[in-house]
Amino acid sequence: MNYEEIFQKYKVETLKGRYITLNDIEPVLKKWNTNNQLQEVGTSVLGAPIYSYEIGTGKNRIFLWSQMHGNEGTTTKALFDFLNILQSKTELSEALLDNFTFYCLPIVNPDGATLYTRENANQ
């Protein structure tokens, strides 16, 4: 398996740079929301939506999250690249989706992401 090739093929090109916010991820999530997999499960202190995205039908459940610390966007980019692989309808993605259900909170701390800080707005 050529990991460099996989990385290049499934990298979400719209997520780049150091700062990743809800404004960056919402268009991608909404594009992928073909079967009501995207849910708003809460709101931040400042009123920003906190999303959950579910994909797969397997009995093994995996919980994924990113940006608990708002200034750590690298994990969000990696998470979206992985979710993009799951969208690919390849033999690998179908095997993963048949065996696992992935529950994702793509940005746990949207306020911190907007302010580019580790803390949330709850002071």
Which role fits each region the language model picked out?
Residues 1-123:
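Structured catalytic-domain cores with a bias toward divalent-metal coordination
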